[in-house]
């Protein structure tokens, strides 16, 4: 490649921003396409604001630690949880793009006030996944999904959101790490963007990311070993005996999923004997991640059925999650269904 060609390629890459990519994906400039592009831009803005605050967290008062409150999930609320949730609301309240926002941090959806422009979409999100990592400066993330409102929701129950994961229009996450990355899908592949701080723009880094068919990584909180059902314990015993496997678990779903997408393997958050439904929420954690991974050629399951087929019965419903490379997920499923198969594992 000549110097000129390399220069042009670099310029083309720097000009392929998130909003431009969304419009290219939709192959349209109609009102719906413009709205989705604007939605993604607002999500990106929220990500930039959260990334900026995280980068200064150790230097600012009132950023680290707990608020003293407990959220709808029964979890202690971090100060950054509150900030991140408020950022998403502020980014969308005056946008005219959404009619409501539903979050891990709110018992009921936030409805756009009548004195503000109201759109036709719903944003579901986990504003700060893995927030327990903030105080020790490890990776955290934001997870999001976009759905279109169906019906009027006059009773404010958001019952139209209780549909399977195939109804998501878009899904993605923002990873706050050494660089800030935004990974998204509109159902046309999975694409990776990196925030260029000098431009203030998310620039395309990987188009049509493909997860390896199998991988050596298994990501699970083994501290729960004796709380699991026997099939999950048997799977973990199996990988302990096999050469080539490597355990990686950070406590932040976004960070662990990003590793699995890039390197292959499997992430598990199974149910326990006490809580068979597990910990992860379906609508704004598990389903968006499943959508992304399947668009990258991976597989997502509850262990007994495809994750995207699950229909929630309430907004904050939980689900077990097994997600990653197709061969690795199938192996875990085989233990749950009591038909163990031999995996293909890359040596490390």
Curated annotation (Swiss-Prot):
Keyword Oxidoreductase: no
Binding locations of Mg(2+) 1: 104, 126, 128
Chain positions recorded as substrate binding sites: 129-132, 221, 249, 279
Gene Ontology cellular component terms for the protein in this record: cytosol
Pathway assigned in UniProt: Carbohydrate biosynthesis; Calvin cycle
Catalysed conversion reaction: beta-D-fructose 1,6-bisphosphate + H2O = beta-D-fructose 6-phosphate + phosphate
Enzyme Commission code: 3.1.3.11
One Pfam match: FBPase_C
Record keywords, A-Z: Calvin cycle, Carbohydrate metabolism, Cytoplasm, Hydrolase, Magnesium, Metal-binding
Residues that bind Mg(2+) 2: 126, 129, 285
Gene3D superfamilies: 3.40.190.80, Fructose-1,6-Bisphosphatase, subunit A, domain 1
GO biological process per UniProt: fructose 1,6-bisphosphate metabolic process; fructose 6-phosphate metabolic process; fructose metabolic process; gluconeogenesis; reductive pentose-phosphate cycle; sucrose biosynthetic process
Cofactor or coenzyme needed: Mg(2+)
Free-text cofactor note: Binds 2 magnesium ions per subunit.
InterPro entries membership: FBPase_C_dom (IPR044015), FBPase_class-1 (IPR000146), FBPase_N (IPR033391), FBPtase (IPR028343), Fructose_bisphosphatase_AS (IPR020548)
Gene Ontology molecular functions: fructose 1,6-bisphosphate 1-phosphatase activity; magnesium ion binding
Subcellular locations according to the entry: Cytoplasm
Binding partners and assembly: Homotetramer.
Similarity comment: Belongs to the FBPase class 1 family.
HAMAP family named among the record's database cross-references: FBPase_class1 (MF_01855)
Name this protein carries in UniProt: Fructose-1,6-bisphosphatase class 1
């Amino acid at each position: 490649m000549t110097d000129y060609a390399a220069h042009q390629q670099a310029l083309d890459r720097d000009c392929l921003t998130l909003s431009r990519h969304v419009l290219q994906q939709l192959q349209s400039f109609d009102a719906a396409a413009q709205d989705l592009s604007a939605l993604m831009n607002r999500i990106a803005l929220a990500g930039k604001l959260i990334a900026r605050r995280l980068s200064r967290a150790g230097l600012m008062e009132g950023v680290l630690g707990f608020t003293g409150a407990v959220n709808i999930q029964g979890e202690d609320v971090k100060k950054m949880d509150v900030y991140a949730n408020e950022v998403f609301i502020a980014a969308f309240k005056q946008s005219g793009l959404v009619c409501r926002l539903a979050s891990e941090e709110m018992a009921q959806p936030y409805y756009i006030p009548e004195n503000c422009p109201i759109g036709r979409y719903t944003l579901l999100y986990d504003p700060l996944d893995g927030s327990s990592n903030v105080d020790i400066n490890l990776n955290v993330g934001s997870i999001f999904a976009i759905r279109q409102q169906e019906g009027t929701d006059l009773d404010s129950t958001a019952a139209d959101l209780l549909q399977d994961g195939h109804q998501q229009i878009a899904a993605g996450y923002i990873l706050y790490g050494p660089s800030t990355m935004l990974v998204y899908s509109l159902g046309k592949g999975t694409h990776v963007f990196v925030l260029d701080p000098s431009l203030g723009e998310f620039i395309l880094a990987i188009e049509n990311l493909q997860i390896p068919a199998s991988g050596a990584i298994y990501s699970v909180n083994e501290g729960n070993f004796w709380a699991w059902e026997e099939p999950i314990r048997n799977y973990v015993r199996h990988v302990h005996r096999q050469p080539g496997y490597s355990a990686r678990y950070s406590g932040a779903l976004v960070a662990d999923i990003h590793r699995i997408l890039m390197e292959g393997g499997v992430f598990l958050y199974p149910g326990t004997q006490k809580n068979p439904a597990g910990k992860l929420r379906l609508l704004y954690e598990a389903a968006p991640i499943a959508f992304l991974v399947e668009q990258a050629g991976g597989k997502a399951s509850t262990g007994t059925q495809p994750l995207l087929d699950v229909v929630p019965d309430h907004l904050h419903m939980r689900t077990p999650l097994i997600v990653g490379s197709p061969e690795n997920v199938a192996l875990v499923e085989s233990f749950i269904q009591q038909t163990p198969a031999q995996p293909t594992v890359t040596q490390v």
